């Protein structure tokens, strides 16, 4: 049976479903067919997801769009019932590049508008990935242009730190509705989450499973899927450890972005609304924090506006 996530209201009055399907292919093997993205999107909509997250840099917007189109054609959903997020890449940060970049994404997605457009990183790069010195405040002007043109219903950012969020809010007439950042048990981001929420900016959480899902990194900090704290919660609520971690984020007021191409797991990852963790259980998971990221962006550490 399909399970639909509740929605919350953003600071611009629009609403957003509180679970999104992630479509980034960072852990995909070269042998994996990109068509699995189209199939995953279709299965997700079939399972009740109404929020799909993608990005220009994922190079799968066409497949995301195909999955959406197929679901609409088969009567599973209407466009208006869906919430689609995509992101501006680092080499399109000049104000006059933003709207054309979004138009290119819309063309690939087969959509007339995007529900949420994000600046993927505060870092600007040239096409060869060398550093550029474009201020993200200029980029935000282009994002505001996109919203005024009706191409993006809502606009926000991703991977911004607290100082950058404060500076952006102080120098813009449209406040970002979202900061999408990595949040999981080993990277709980409590100060940044609290800062965003205090400004009325919602937080989307990517890499929600952290290192609990084996990623093959040596020296990665705990917990793992057999951790006693997590397995006790899974047994108590009759859920998987993955579902416990997603519910942990929801109970912190966050919007998790689980990623899967497995039909059963896609459905499992939204089956989160018949239980709730206690304050003490959320606090116990917070204790795993090591400020250790799954997604390593340190290659850009010497670039202007690196969000350390």
Swiss-Prot record:
Name the UniProt record assigns to this protein: Aldo-keto reductase AKR2E4
Tissues of expression: Detected in hemolymph (at protein level). Detected in larval ovary.
Lineage: Eukaryota, Metazoa, Ecdysozoa, Arthropoda, Hexapoda
Function as written in the Swiss-Prot or TrEMBL entry: NADP-dependent oxidoreductase with high 3-dehydroecdysone reductase activity. May play a role in the regulation of molting. Has lower activity with phenylglyoxal and isatin (in vitro). Has no activity with NADH as cosubstrate. Has no activity with nitrobenzaldehyde and 3-hydroxybenzaldehyde.
Binding-site positions, NADP(+): 22-29, 53, 158-159, 215, 259-269
Signal sequence region: none
Induction of synthesis: Up-regulated by the insecticide diazinon.
SUPFAM superfamilies attached to this UniProt entry: NAD(P)-linked oxidoreductase
């Amino acid at each position: 049976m399909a399970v639909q996530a509740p929605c919350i209201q953003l600071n611009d009055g629009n609403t957003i479903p509180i679970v999104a399907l992630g479509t980034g292919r960072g852990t995909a093997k070269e042998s994996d067919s990109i068509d699995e993205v189209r199939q995953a999107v279709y299965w997700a909509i079939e399972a009740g997801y109404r929020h799909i997250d993608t990005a220009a840099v994922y190079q799968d917007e066409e497949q995301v769009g195909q999955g959406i189109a197929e679901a609409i054609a088969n009567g599973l959903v209407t466009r208006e019932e869906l919430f689609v997020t995509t992101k501006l890449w680092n080499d399109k940060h000049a104000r006059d590049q933003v709207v054309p970049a979004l138009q290119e994404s819309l063309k690939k997605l087969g959509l007339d508008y995007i529900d949420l457009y994000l600046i993927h990183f505060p870092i600007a790069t040239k096409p060869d990935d060398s550093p550029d010195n474009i201020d993200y405040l200029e980029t935000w002007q282009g994002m505001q242009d996109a919203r005024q043109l009706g191409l993006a219903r809502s606009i926000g950012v991703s991977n911004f730190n607290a100082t950058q969020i404060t500076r952006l809010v102080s120098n813009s007439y449209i406040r970002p509705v979202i900061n999408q950042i990595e949040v999981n048990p080993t990277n709980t981001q409590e100060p940044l989450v609290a800062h965003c929420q205090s400004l009325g900016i919602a937080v989307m959480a990517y890499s929600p499973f952290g290192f609990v899902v084996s990623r093959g990194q040596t020296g990665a900090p705990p917990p793992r899927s057999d951790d006693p704290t997590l397995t006790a919660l899974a047994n108590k609520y009759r859920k998987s450890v993955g579902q416990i971690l997603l519910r942990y984020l929801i109970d912190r007021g966050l919007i998790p972005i689980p990623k899967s191409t497995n039909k059963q797991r896609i459905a499992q990852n939204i089956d989160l609304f018949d239980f709730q963790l206690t304050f003490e259980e959320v606090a116990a998971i917070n204790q795993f924090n090591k400020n250790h990221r799954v997604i390593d962006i340190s290659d850009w550490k010497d670039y202007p506006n690196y969000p350390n």
